[in-house]
Each structure stands twice: as C-alpha cells, then as structure tokens.
Amino acid sequence: MAEINGTCDPRFEALREILVANLDSGADTGASVAVMLGGELVVDMWGGTIAANNPAPWEHDTIVNVWSTTKTMMALSALLLVDRGLLDVDAPVATYWPEFAQNGKEKVRVRHFLGHTSGVSGWDKPVTVDDVFDWESSTAKLATQAPWWEPGSQSGYHAMNQGHLVGEVVRRITGMKLGEFFRAEIAEPFGIDFHIGLPESEFGRVATLTPPPPPSNDLRALGQDHPAIKTFKGPLVLAEYAGRDEWRRA
C-alpha cells in the first residue's frame, strides 16, 4: 500500500483512500492534495514519486506544471490592476497596447481577453512552441492578425495565448513581465509557492509529468480552418514539453 504523508481530516478519509488507490494502481505516479474548508486547511497530503523513472519521493515542497490553472493566477494579476484603477476591462485593448488595433481588432476589449471571446484564440501564422517562448515576436504576431470571429460574439478557448494577450497588457501598464508582476505583487507578499517562470534554482524539486493517453475525441470533421483546430494545433503542445528548461523558465 502506498505511503501517504501529511494530514487528512477524518471527514476526508475517502479522499485519502482514492489517493492511495491511484498510487497503488499506477494511475498516478505521485501527487499532492490540499483542501481548504471554511478557511481551514483540512487536507494536506502527498505520496508517490516525482517521476515514473525516478524513485525519489514526492515531498511536501514538490511542485509540478499545472497547465491552465496558471490562467487563474494570470487573471488575478489583471484584476489586481483593476482594483488599483490601472486597468479597465471595458476599455479597448489598444488603450494599453496600441499595436493591437489592426485587422478588425480595434474594438476588442480587455474583458474579451479574460473571457475567451476576443476572436484571437491562437496564432494565425504557423508557430512552434519555440516561437511562443519568444515574447516579443509572438505578441507581435498576435497584434497583426485578424480575429477568427467577431470579437465578443462567441467564446473560444484561448488555450496557449491568453497569457500572451493579458500578459502583454500587464507589461504595457507596469513595465513588468506577467511572471515578474505576479511574483512581486502576489506570490511573495502572500508566501505562495506558485511560479510563472520558474527560477533554475527551483528545477530540482519539479515532478515530471507522465504523458496521458491520446484523446478519444476526433475533431478532424471540423476542418482545418475551424478556430478550435487552429487553436489547438498552433502550436501543438505535448505533455513532455513541460520538462524542457525553456518551458519552465517561460
């Protein structure tokens, strides 16, 4: 039976049993679980190893790539600027990022970025993950392209570029990269061990992701020009990319 460390309120024993079962079956290599209830930390437990091919144990301070959970921290950063009166979500994006007002995007508002309705849910021009690491180039491409639908009229998940869109607005207002602003104004003041751009000094405590099985849904019937296809293929992101140093620094 898998060894579970930490604490678990008896009311959440079923959750502990699920974690044990997942580790025993191999459904999870390693994991941590925390639950807050009424402002109280009632579950804080972890177990397993940091990688399928590494027997090092998952520790209390092990961290892991959390994919789009980062969008929550990005939104929190933007809303902090709203709270300070520095950002108006109803203002055109061009108020803060003038170059964005091209090719029919003049009326795109900041709230369209935050709500996945801007019509710019991905890169129009072919891009690779390496291209996305180049902030100046990748945001410039977003500024020049036309929206894929009328901004504000529909929703389409901004899978890989929402951080670039909102992050560039944050940068134009503060002069700081999104990760720098988040660290200085949110993470460090509140003692939060969450990173947008991980320092190399922290690489040693990062767990390695195990790629999931291929998706069962087939989206080819939508056609190559469908916004969803263009979004998720430009660029195509694989789980193993999260183990790259460039990804961790981004």
Spans of features found by a protein language model:
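Terminal-appendage/accessory-domain detector
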Residues: M1-E3, E40-V42, A242-A250
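Short, conserved catalytic-motif segment at the N-terminal edge
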Residues: E3-W67, D88, T144
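Short alpha-helical patches at coil-to-helix transitions and adjacent helical residues
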Residues: F12, I63, T69-A75, K107, ...
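Residue-level preference for non-acidic, small/hydrophobic
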Residues: L19, V33, G39, K71-M74, ...
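Generic short alpha-helical segment signal, independent of protein family or function
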Residues: V20, D24, G47, L79-L87, ...
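Short secondary-structure junction motifs
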Residues: D28-G30, R84, D88-D90, K105, ...
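Short, surface-exposed loop or secondary-structure junction motifs
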Residues: N103-A250
